[in-house]
């Protein structure tokens, strides 16, 4: 495969409702799309970096620079045997996994299209449907939170995740468990706590959560190991895991019992598969986290989630949960049973709506 050209586009997509976490509120997503021309095949990837360096040090601006000034010169015109090689070819760039993933995942889309295979099959996926959960941001009232959960359950979602932060943790969990005693419920702290808050987090053991996601520092595997030894509830690591070696360290130190895999955070499909395989060998279940992706990023998540050890419902939701109108056709839909069908068309299995993308584009740069 030879990369002939890439087109970088920044689009703006407005969320149907604001999404609040422990580090801020989003109502508009700045999304960086990569369209790659690989041997004449048009292939797509998405960068999940945000506008601000709060979830990660990466932003839309840093990713644009890395893709334009470093990734493109490294890859252009080079003979590349397989998409799985791109991760290693970009290894001289330290970090910047979200930028790398944007171009790396496009290569996977291209290879799948060239081989006339669904991306899920090229990756080694075994599922024809994936179980879906939903992520609900911090709500201003408990009543509002309960209403959001009722809405998600009515739509068929199999697992409910709520965002928490210091002062908005035990009370909302208690209220939800009282109202919904048997639902699969988890919380996500996005690093809002410190090890000194262990007693507060231990209080959540009483509510039979399936996991507490990333309670402590975004790069602190050691403290998570100390915390996990005090909790009955499994810890799931998110922000701490950037590659297979971070996953290995977390497993060997018993810092978690579950790992969240996000394509952007780990640098693309090849890295995600390595983490998946390591976790599978160590009986650590994984699931796919979400970053408020457009349909292109969501399509890549669906393909990845078809791998065997993605055994817990992920954050891959319907397009209409977040966007009035997505940028792919057909849009992602969730069945009444709370699953998404893995597409069987070649590549990511969804067609980018070029007219819609063009209308949303704020800036564009063609590199050839």
Where are these regions (language model features)?
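Shared catalytic-loop signature of beta/alpha-barrel
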Residues: 71, 208, 219-236, 241-339
């Amino acid at each position: 495969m030879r990369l002939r050209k890439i087109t970088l586009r920044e689009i703006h997509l407005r969320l149907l409702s604001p999404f609040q976490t422990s580090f801020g509120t989003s109502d508009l997503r700045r999304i960086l799309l990569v369209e790659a021309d690989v041997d004449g095949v048009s292939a797509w990837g998405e960068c999940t970096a945000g506008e601000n360096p709060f979830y990660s040090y990466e932003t839309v601006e840093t990713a644009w620079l890395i893709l334009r000034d470093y990734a493109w010169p490294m890859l252009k015109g080079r003979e590349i045997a397989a998409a799985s090689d791109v991760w290693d070819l970009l290894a001289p760039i330290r970090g910047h996994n979200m930028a790398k993933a944007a171009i790396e995942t496009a290569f996977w889309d291209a290879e799948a299209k060239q081989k006339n295979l669904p991306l899920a099959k090229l990756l080694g996926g075994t599922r024809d449907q994936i179980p879906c959960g939903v992520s609900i941001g911090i709500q201003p009232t408990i009543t509002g939170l309960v209403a959001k959960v009722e809405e998600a359950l009515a739509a068929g979602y199999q697992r409910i995740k709520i965002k928490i932060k210091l002062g908005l943790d035990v009370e909302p969990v208690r209220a939800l468990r009282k109202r919904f005693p048997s639902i699969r419920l988890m919380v996500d702290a996005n690093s809002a706590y410190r090890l000194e808050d262990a007693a507060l987090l231990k209080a959540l053991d009483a509510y039979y959560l399936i996991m507490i996601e990333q309670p402590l520092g975004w790069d602190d595997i050691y403290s998570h190991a100390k915390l996990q030894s005090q909790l009955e509830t499994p810890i799931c690591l998110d922000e701490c895991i950037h590659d297979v070696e971070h996953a290995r360290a977390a497993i060997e130190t018993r810092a978690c019992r579950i790992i969240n895999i996000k394509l952007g955070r780990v640098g693309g499909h090849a890295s995600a598969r390595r983490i998946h395989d390591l976790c599978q060998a160590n009986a650590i279940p994984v699931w796919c986290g979400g970053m408020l992706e457009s349909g292109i990023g969501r399509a890549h998540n669906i393909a990845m989630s078809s791998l065997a050890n993605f055994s817990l419902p992920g954050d891959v939701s319907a397009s209409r949960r977040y966007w009035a109108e997505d940028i792919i056709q057909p849009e992602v839909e969730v069945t009444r049973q709370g699953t998404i069908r893995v597409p069987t068309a070649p590549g990511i299995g969804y067609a980018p709506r070029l007219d819609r993308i063009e209308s949303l584009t704020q800036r564009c740069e063609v590199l050839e």
